[in-house]
Every structure is written in C-alpha cells, then in structure tokens.
Amino acid sequence: MEENIINLIDENGVESQFEIILTLEAEGKEYAILMPLDDEEAEEALIFRIDEDEEGEILIPLESDEEYETVVAVYTAIMEEEGLNYDEDESNGLN
C-alpha cells in the first residue's frame, strides 16, 4: 500500500480509504487534507489535525469553526503560491 493512502474507520465501523493530498502547519499544529478514494464522485476533502498518542500519529477531527477557517486560510495561501485556482465560493472543496 502506498504511504499516502490510509484507512479510516467511522463511528459505524465502516472502513474507507483516503489519500493524504497535503499536510500543512497552522498555528503550530499539523493538519492533513484527505480525499476519499472509495467515492469517485467525492469533490470535498476532509481536514484532520495530526496528533500523537502512545501508539504514534492519530487524526483528530477539527474542533471548531475557527480552527477550520485557520486551516483553510493556510491551504488557500499554499494553493495561490503554487498558482492553483482558488474559488472562495466553493470553500476549496474542503470540509
């Protein structure tokens, strides 16, 4: 399995595959932008904070709208720096 492909299990025990399309740092914390691989029609990526526990790295859902907005702002800056299109009305496809 490729290093940037991970499996996540939701609260219902359903396992899904995601590709880590980008990791970034915002306000001293690290975040992962994930795109679902199981749903080929999916247009929205998911954002998780990367944290660590005794077993290694874990992904934590964002806890607030403020944290989400901070990560989206950093993501937007990275995309603009890379010369990629940004459509504020579509929130960059991030969820």
Swiss-Prot record:
Signal peptide positions (record): none
Q: Which domain of life is it from?
A: Bacteria
**Family (UniProt):** Belongs to the UPF0473 family.
Record's protein name: UPF0473 protein CD630_12860
